[in-house]
Amino acid sequence: MAEFVRAQIFGTTFEITSRYTDLQPVGMGAFGLVCSARDQLTAQPVAVKKIMKPFSTPVLSKRTYRELKLLKHLRHENIISLSDIFISPLEDIYFVTELLGTDLHRLISSRPLEKQFIQYFLYQIMRGLKYVHSAGVVHRDLKPSNILINENCDLKICDFGLARIQDPQMTGYVSTRYYRAPEIMLTWQKYDAKVDVWSAACIFAEMLLGAPLFPGKDHVNQFSIITELLGTPPDDVIQTICSENTLRFVKSLPKREPQDLAKLPKFLALVHPDKKPEEDEDYKNTINLLKAMLVYNPKDRISAEAALAAPYLAPYHDETDEPVAEEKFDWSFNDADLPVDTWKIMMYSEILDFHNIDQGGDINPALVEGAGLNQQGFQ
């Protein structure tokens, strides 16, 4: 049995194994608190995420199980990787991952980003999305604060708690407003991996401009701001709207023509000072990729894989080093409506599997407390 120690962080009890020391809070979300820590086994800094009350409701249990399964399955240089997981005696779940120094939101807020950094960051985002989408997974909540970066400019996408299967009937009200694709706002159904490409486009523009491209105050204002830039949605998009209220709202908006992004003052500021916009190939490549990502109809929106081959990302593009998933993620559990105790047993099973512990018969929850800490040289 592993030895557990307790610490109070922001009024929350962190109950972790003695393997991890020097806890410092780094962030808090709706579903968990994240601390940095030192891994005594590897002498490396790590991030320890406490999942708040994972077994309080079936919905939270399922969400935690989904995130655990995804973190186990997704193995890619641009996706955060799981190094340890355990359940404390208080039945809180802790995910341990690599620690990166900052996130893209903090970086954008602190200083203007130079062109080569924007290119490299976008390349890594799209490289990660190509892999995620090839696994049959849609992130659904891509935003600057979910994109982690270290001192070497290595980038990793994190927080897969809202991720879902690629399904033409996918539904739900997801994604932080500024980065939300129009098909989510308009239909609440029939969307796919292209919602992540839209979010990536909004992040791309934010890196270029230093401020959100579509800073809507609410759901209605958000869509109105999008139409100011991209014009009224075309008929083929409007025809997909299923909600009568949404359809009435869209038809009530004034008819707007799309603006030419390349001629907008906020983008013209990106043109090389010694060149005209039409002479600046880098500028044209920048705007062309952004336009291809900001298309109303997801069928016509560029994919993550195709974006990697765009001229803007040519300095980094290498098709032989942009892997896809070896197999699709198994979503068979996703439609299950199960009680908490069943999700708990399934969670225990996944944790034991992560630590390569033979489950042999009934699962004993006590085995999972600090699971794996006596395996493979662990403390």
From Swiss-Prot:
Where Phosphotyrosine occurs, residue numbers?
173
Q: What is its EC number?
A: 2.7.11.24
The entry marks the following residues as binding ATP, namely: 26-34, 49
- Tell me, what controls this protein's activity? Activated by tyrosine and threonine phosphorylation.
> Where in or outside the cell is it found?
Cytoplasm; Nucleus
Q: Which reaction does it catalyse?
A: L-seryl-[protein] + ATP = O-phospho-L-seryl-[protein] + ADP + H(+); L-threonyl-[protein] + ATP = O-phospho-L-threonyl-[protein] + ADP + H(+)
Chief location of this protein within or outside the cell: cytoplasm
Q: Name one Pfam family in it.
A: Pkinase
**GO BP terms, alphabetized:** cellular hyperosmotic response; cellular response to oxidative stress; establishment or maintenance of cell polarity; hyperosmotic response; osmosensory signaling pathway; protein phosphorylation; stress-activated MAPK cascade
Q: Where is the Protein kinase domain?
A: 20-313
Q: Name one GO cellular component term.
A: nucleus
Instruction: List the GO molecular function terms.
Output: ATP binding; MAP kinase activity; protein serine kinase activity; protein serine/threonine kinase activity
Q: Does the keyword Transport apply?
A: no
The top EC class, named as a word, is transferase
Taxonomy, superkingdom: Eukaryota
Coiled-coil boundaries: none
Which SUPFAM superfamilies did the record assign? Protein kinase-like (PK-like)
> PTM per UniProt?
Dually phosphorylated on Thr-171 and Tyr-173, which activates the enzyme. Phosphorylated by pbsB in response to osmotic and oxidative stresses.
Indicate the residues that form the catalytic site.
Answer: 141 (proton acceptor)
Which residues get modified to Phosphothreonine? 171
Question: What UniProt keywords apply to this chain's record, in alphabetical order?
Answer: Activator, ATP-binding, Cytoplasm, Kinase, Nucleotide-binding, Nucleus, Phosphoprotein, Serine/threonine-protein kinase, Transcription, Transcription regulation, Transferase
Q: What is known of its domains?
A: The TXY motif contains the threonine and tyrosine residues whose phosphorylation activates the MAP kinases.
Which family is this protein grouped under? Belongs to the protein kinase superfamily. Ser/Thr protein kinase family. MAP kinase subfamily. HOG1 sub-subfamily.
What does the function comment of this entry state?
Proline-directed serine/threonine-protein kinase involved in a signal transduction pathway that is activated by changes in the osmolarity of the extracellular environment. Controls osmotic regulation of transcription of target genes.
Designated name of the protein: Mitogen-activated protein kinase hog1
